[in-house]
Amino acid sequence: MLRILVVEDSASMRSFVRNALESDSRSSAGVDVVEASSGFEALRLLPRGPYDLVITDINMPDINGLELISFIRKSESHKATPVLIISTQSSERDRARGLSLGANGYLIKPFSPEVLQTEVWRLLPNGTAQAKPHG
């Protein structure tokens, strides 16, 4: 089963992401979506990993997505975890900054469930549902 941490302050966007991930037919082993409504909450949830992927917004109260990515990349236990940014910040500069801080992908909102699913599978190790067991 895949474990994906979704960090997004908008409840409707978290629900959209969850539904897109859970409805993807490529996930025959299932997806465990763990939700955080802020960067601070994500920091509390990271030790409960491991996660196969972290999906994060940039603009959030307290700790923003870029600060979260910096923390993840400095963390010995999470530094190899792929990170996907989902954001309304659409300039080339915003995208370059997120990727230079260690994000593996960057989607500009709004996007379709299919675009999200394709990007998620691109970022997963080997691009398959054969994720490591969690326990």
Walk through the language-model features, giving the residues of each.
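Acidic, metal-coordinating helix/loop segments flanking the phosphotransfer/catalytic sites
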Residues: E35-L53, A96
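Receiver (REC) domain active-site loop signature in two-component systems and cognate sites
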Residues: M60
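Conserved acidic carboxylate
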Residues: E8
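C-terminal output helix
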Residues: F111-V120
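Two-component/phosphorelay signaling modules centered on CheY-like receiver
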Residues: A11-V34
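Active-site residues of response regulator receiver
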Residues: D57, S87
